[in-house]
Amino acid sequence: MRIKYEVSAGGLVLRRNGAQLEALLIGRGQPRVWSLPKGHVENRETHEQAALREVREETGCWAEILSKLSDISYWFYLNRTKHKKSVHFYLMRYLSGDTANHDHEVDEAAWFEIRAAKKNLKYVNEKRLIDLGLEYLQAEGTGLFETETVALVTEALQDISAS
């Protein structure tokens, strides 16, 4: 059997919206399957460049990378070929843009309060990225977002670990 190897990159994009910390998700299909924005690394692109490009294309939003989060690998079958896909995920901060400007590859891009984002994500490995992102923000302190955000992160971590 043939095996095809694929490399993708994507991001967990966060923003503060009033008293909430929000994550940017993409939705496909009906009913919606929610996931993090990601896509193939193109020729001569770094993983970071691909992650930023895919976030911009799939969500209509610009972001900046704060940190590498994790690599996720999984297997799937397509057209009688076995695929191994590795995805490099980054923690990102929202800069600008409008989710209405997402591209045709997704049906919807939307902001979710961080706990709702974790609940709505389809894939367990992506749910874990929410935890990793919150843990990173808590450890790094307030320099990445406004001061009040650390309290939101701590509260979200407590709620998520209790559920």
How does the language model describe each region?
Residues 41-128, 159-162:
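Unchanged
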Residues 119, 124-163:
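Charged phosphate-binding loop/patch that engages nucleotide di/tri-phosphates or the phosphate backbone
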Residues 40, 51-53, 82, 136-139, ...:
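Short, charged/polar low-complexity linear motifs in solvent-exposed/disordered segments
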Residues 1-36:
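N-terminal strand-loop-strand
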Residues 15-20, 38-42, 80-81, 154-159:
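Short acidic/polar alpha-helix capping motifs at helix-coil junctions
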Residues 16, 95, 135:
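Residue-level marker of positions within ordered structural domains that often coincide
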